[in-house]
């Protein structure tokens, strides 16, 4: 089974409300919200006010992907803005701070996730595996939309599926980047 979460980054920012209606009318129940700070990745996108505006406009699951340095500083604000899932990158801070971020996300009633860049091994999730509701695997280099799917990430997904089956069978796996009708099949 899979869930399709279209990325708001692919939308027209002047018409995000209309884009959310289109996503929902197409049968999707999730929307992926990429937050970039210009430091962790070279691009800058949106912040908490946009997430809060999206939350007021839709009941879709807001899957907020923080591609930002030291996300512990901001997870509370994104949860309070209405994120249903908040994803932090294992590479964005220390293990200790990322564990604190996951705990804070859960304490605020949201689901917690970690993400791995393409060059980060599957084993990097081990310190977090018992605390996450989802693991996101970047299938492009994070920072810009429109890139091609990195097929070599399929091995990482298989390794993560095995780890989750053993230690956290309820954990969801998510791929982000280059997903289309061919790569998503």
For the regions a language model picked out, list residue spans one by one.
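Conserved N-terminal beta1-alpha1 strand-loop-helix module at the mouth
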Residues: 1-87, 92-100, 104-107, 111-112, ...
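Short beta->alpha connector loops at strand-helix junctions that form conserved
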Residues: 89-91, 138-141
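Short glycine-rich, flexible loops that bind phosphorylated cofactors or substrates
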Residues: 95, 121, 143-144
């Amino acid at each position: 089974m899979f869930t399709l979460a279209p990325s708001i980054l692919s939308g027209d920012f002047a018409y995000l409300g209309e884009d959310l209606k289109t996503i929902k009318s197409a049968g999707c129940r999730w929307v992926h919200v990429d937050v970039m700070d210009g430091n962790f990745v070279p691009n800058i996108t949106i912040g908490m006010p946009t997430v809060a505006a999206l939350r007021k406009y839709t009941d879709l699951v807001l899957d907020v992907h923080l591609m930002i340095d030291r996300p512990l500083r901001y997870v509370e604000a994104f949860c309070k803005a209405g994120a249903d899932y908040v994803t932090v990158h294992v590479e964005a801070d220390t293990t200790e701070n990322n564990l604190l971020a996951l705990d804070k996300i859960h304490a605020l009633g949201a689901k917690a996730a970690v993400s791995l860049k393409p060059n980060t091994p599957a084993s990097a999730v081990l310190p977090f595996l018992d605390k996450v509701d989802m693991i996101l695997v970047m299938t492009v280099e994070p920072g810009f939309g429109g890139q091609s799917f990195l097929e070599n990430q399929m091995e990482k997904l298989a390794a993560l599926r095995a780890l989750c089956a053993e230690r956290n069978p309820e954990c969801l796996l998510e791929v982000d980047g280059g997903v289309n009708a061919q790569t998503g099949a």
